[in-house]
């Protein structure tokens, strides 16, 4: 039995009605006609069923970070109107919903993909371009902008995707980060980017907004993080402003 599963969870500034979390997954509706309307109906049914917190499929923070060149982002007023359909539908059933921000890095199916180092993914025909120091700060700015847009759209929070080989995880893992500057080398340098993203997002959205950090507990590849390093990162992103750590 799970005696705490259906008990409320107090986050300090808001309370989840239970600890049931619907994890992020792509519905295939993000880029189709009437996609926002259909996603609103889809997520509303989950809220109606009593899920405490819903996380959407990944929304790209910029064009180079999307899963493919036509990935939906949250930029225009039209985008905001579409996403408000989703948040309004979930809130009508007393649900809470966070939008996942997914930067795919070298997993992007696009010749414009970027990463910490120019190391080709085994699942992708394209080789990423290694980011300059200035461009890394631009990526952080895009995470922040998208988080603020999500807040404007009525989301209760965002999930920052930092696991499973995607962009932030590519900086963390030594096998995909061969930089010799302040963003590479030591583990402290390699986790600098996700910490800075969380810190900057928290600074921008204020205290009364959920920030979930998606953390890889186990990389399952050579050159991945050790258990001690994962714990170190978890503590660091919590200190930087994460409300919830999701694995």
Question: Locations of the language-model features?
Answer:
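A broad, low-specificity signal for short, low-complexity segments enriched in glycine/proline
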Residues: 16-17, 57-61
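N-terminal binding-site loop/beta-alpha segment at the start of enzyme catalytic domains
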Residues: 11-12, 19-37
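N-terminal amphipathic alpha-helix/helix-capping segment at the start of soluble metabolic enzymes
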Residues: 1-21, 90, 199-206
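Alpha/beta enzyme core
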Residues: 30-36, 40-49, 53, 60-84, ...
